[in-house]
Amino acid sequence: MKQIMIFLTSFMLLAMTGQTALAKDVQVSGSLLGKSSQEQAKQQVLTSELITLYGSKDSAELTYQIPAGASSGNQQLVIEYEASNLLISPSSLTVVIDDEPVKTLKLDGDSKRKTVKLNLNKSQSAQGYHNVSLKFYGVMKEGVCVRQDTSGNWIKIYPDSRLTLADSSEAKGTSLDHYPYPFAQSGNTAEETAIVIPDNPSSAEIEAAVKTEGYLKTVDSSVSIAYVTESELKKIDKPTIVIGVDKHWNGKVKKLLKQAGLQAKGENLLLAERVLKAEGKQQPVLFAQAASEDALTKKISVMTDQTYTGQLSGDTLSISKLQQTEKKESDKLTLENFGAGDITIGADKTSSAHYFYPASAVLDENQSAKLSLKLKKSETIQASTAENESASQAAELKVMINGQPHSVRLDELGKEDKNGFYHVTVKVDPKLLQKNRYIDIQFVTTGLKENNPCNTTDEEKWVFIDKNSTLSYAIKGMSPSADFQEWPLPYAGNQDQTTLIVLPDTVSQSKLEELSLVTESFGNEAQHSYTVKKSSDVTANDAKGRNLIFIGGINQFSLLKEKSSDLLVPQEKNGSFDVSSFEMLNETTKQVVFTQASVWDSRYTMAVFAPSKGDGTAVTKEIISYLNSNDESATVLNETNSQQVFTNHQQLKSETNSSDAEQPTQDHSQKWMYIGVLALIMVVAAVFIWIAVRRKKRKTDTE
């Protein structure tokens, strides 16, 4: 039934627009626009790390993406390289774009770092992804049967290599087909986007804005998001998303909506992408508007859930029905999830590109993880195994996971299945998967090149890796215990009721940034795991049956203030927290964070992020960084004036040790108590027996 609903929703999304169209232009006052999107030259890195190719033949595969709406001219590919000074003619580097040779560079032993700039033609500038192959052929010595595969036969490709969209590129307009471009785009550097919300945003508007930011960052982790309220909006000088309920706009945004003729109706969510133009300047703006907060809350997932974002099209959509998909934290990733297709590497192309996927925040480091590979290999590898044992030992596939190699012997793959695939399982350290924010996978082959210069054939040794190969790991259970050692559990991950994050009624830009820090630490797939509400929108009944997070000063939450005497960290008369009982200094404490059983429902937990006093900053990057990396038990932590973070871990450890030490003493005391009682019973019994015997004897003597 759920699949049918999603299909119907997909059909409705497509039916709500006629044909694909570019965003409509809206003429505005010149004072509203800052610098134009045309002035913002964009660069796209081709590789994030140094690439080294070794002769005599080697190659590397790179990709670039032409954004939607970019000009088909004035685009340039820049390759920064340096080659060994031992190379002689006919050494070369050939650049191939989309299987078409573009340029061959002569390498003649000049070891200086060089730059080659390639102007892209119309087909190479077409919107979408394009492949770049860098093919290296290195010769170090003339002659017949001369080995060229030495350590001095190399060329380096620098991370400065890039795609440049020149300043004069004329945007053709954008549409919802390309969302989230131009607000975020994988591969771009220094992307900037603004999210505009009403001056006094409601709970629904805050949640929609933060979840939209979270989605944009899954597409481009380097994108910089700035929150702007309507009254703070002086100029639109970057791609902008406007999120809100119609009746909450009173200034520039209200005027813009009227100029563009946009108004949400009923319970629909209106999505409209427009290009604002004035005096030769232009900027793209996406309006996400609803007539009610309920409509915004229920339908914002069309912008934040990949199930729906790929179905958007046209310049205007009015979303009427949306099936809420039940998201579960995934414990299995295919190479396709990493953005890879089927991969073929071998003698002429020894390494694949790097593929990335956000690391799960709720991955269980105490349980096993594995990479299940589905492979094919060339018959020539098998032939070399039979003929040359040393060659077979060198034939190897290395899987690089976050820089750590994992070896697969290509002569020990076992038997093929009926479809000709080999199935290999590689054990992976689960801690390695959380080493960085993103999991980085690359495949490299060794031992497949022909080492005998007199034995040259056209046989190419290769390994094929199916895109359905999977990386599997365990997800942490939803432990109800209050302990920061398990952060972000139990607040993120799979749960029956979403975590309720409570903010003060007055929400500033800085408070939104604090909220963003907390939700980002939940991980990539956490959009479904939390709900945001302002303090006045939360009742005691809302707080039951779920986990809670409060961000702000205690006095900003009437619900929390009523329970101040039940909080783990006590407060002084002036309202400031007293952390002295946790071996911390009140005088140097700026922020306090603690977790405990919920004071409204002890089956669940709550966490409080607060300034030590007043209504200042409650969440910092230092606190979140500590929580993300912490593996020690702690229920209270503080950040000092010097940005150092301390916890009550040692105190908890001492209490646990004391409890363990007291237990044998108590057991010993109880043992002697039982012995004493037993001895007393025996004495009493003996006395009764003695008295009974005496009475019986007297009675006998009397007779």
From Swiss-Prot:
Signal peptide coordinates: 1-23
Single GO cellular component annotation? plasma membrane
Q: Which GO terms describe its biological process?
A: UDP-alpha-D-glucose metabolic process
> Is ATP-binding among the key words of this record?
no
- Which Pfam family is one of this chain's hits? BcsB
| Residues annotated as transmembrane | 673-693
State the UniProt keywords alphabetically: Cell membrane, Membrane, Signal, Transmembrane, Transmembrane helix
Chief location bin: membrane
Q: Where in the cell is it found?
A: Cell membrane
The membrane-topology field of this record reads:
Single-pass membrane protein
Q: Which domain of life is it from?
A: Bacteria
Note the PANTHER family from the entry.
Answer: CYCLIC DI-GMP-BINDING PROTEIN
Q: What is this protein called?
A: Uncharacterized protein YdaN
